[in-house]
Amino acid sequence: MRVPGLGPLFRWRYARPLLQAPLLVLSVIMILHGLFGPTLAPKNLATTLSWLHFRGVLVLVLLCAGNFFCLACPFMLVRQAARRFFKPRFNWPRALRNKWISVGLFVVILFAYELFALWSSPWWTAWLIVGYFLSVLVVDGFFKHASFCKFVCPIGQFNFVASTLSPFEVKVREQDVCTRCHTKDCIRGRRAPVSDLITIRGCELALFQPSKVGNMDCTFCLDCVHACPHDNIGILSRLPASELMADPIRSGIGYFSRRKDLTALVIVFTFGALLNAFGMVSPVFAVENWLGRALHVQHEAGVLGVIFTFSLIAEPVLLLGMAAWLTRAWAGKTSSGRPRALLPLAVRYTYGLVPLGFGMWLAHYCFHFLTGLYTLIPVTQDAIASLGRPFLGEPRWTLTGVPSNIVQIIEIGFLVLGLAGSLLVTYGLAEDDSPDRPLRAFLPWAAICAVLWCAAMWLIFQPMEMRATLMTG
């Protein structure tokens, strides 16, 4: 926050709306072009920006910086404008204060992406964006605080998990300053001295900064930064993945090891990365045809349902259950002499798979982003020309992107980085969990990491479908 240029910008109270406004305008353009523009996906801004450029930029920003998309989220700008006229009256139901709804929506989006071929449909893509805006207005129109962000938004949950590997975090500079603070404006909000009205809100995601650990559930909204009267909160550097190696109690979250909903989110994040990539390689068609014949299922939804059930439920239960059983058998009792329960073991070590899952998302999304890097230019030229003012010239449809052989090297690098990260995290968990026998506790999870990494490597070497571009693959 003290970086020349950037520091003053982020400390400015209206920095977030300034970043949100361009993305809101871009979202409106995407919706209009998706509904009324060309029906061919590679010539439409909705599909090109959504499925090629946005996803690639998103994962790269998460890797290199942090959850800055949530900071600039255009949906929240619309929500904030609506709240000037309609104040939410209800608190989010206690029974739903978990990730189960967002996990389900995450799976639904992955499923719909394949079933409706969203990458090839500007119309469906536009309505997906519209649906997102409407969902935000409905949820946060009725419920206080940032209920949509914390409990509903599937994109936000993806960002939360991925940002555990980011090099920056919103956190306090000096704990002593927080200890001496009596107002706790970072969570309560800053109040006017006379009227006692909140002039700058505190954290709407219930993350009390002195007890906050890591990036989980943090949208980088900077409300706490602006509310703090001591300028004691900033965007500070940290060791990526460090928050995955320990299990302290976390403000607004609790213990990772006791959150089965968070574990389910991590499972969908990791195994969903492989599943999403599997949907674009040629062997998927052979598998779908074989399943359709074997199960006598004609509709694609039924076949996809079987593939999703195996990939997101059966496979994780089998692999993680086996690894937890071997860890219990090889590592013996805990350091306190208590026998190890199977489910808590699986829950605790599952977080070690996050780097590998993120490596697969990086490899997959950057493949599309880099190979179609320049496709935005002719699509924009064509969109401008359709308005009768072709001042950008004729569309240059021959523009593509980085050669695929170079991109493949980058993909391998991401996967190697993900494997290394997962091995380091799982070994750190093993040392903490079994200080006397860390290697025995570590080996089953190292084997799981190796299996998933080999599957990821196999995927990136398959012929891939060049979705949302005019290229063939």
Task: Give residue spans per PLM region.
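A membrane-cytosol interface segment of integral membrane proteins
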Residues: 217-218, 229
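A short, cysteine/histidine-rich metal-binding "knuckle" motif
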Residues: 213, 223-224
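Membrane-embedded alpha-helical bundles of multi-pass integral membrane proteins
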Residues: 1-185, 201, 207, 225-226, ...
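Alpha-helical membrane segments and immediately flanking helix-loop junctions
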Residues: 190, 221-222
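Conserved short loop/turn motifs at secondary-structure junctions
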Residues: 66, 212-215
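Solvent-exposed, extramembrane regions of membrane proteins
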Residues: 190-213, 232
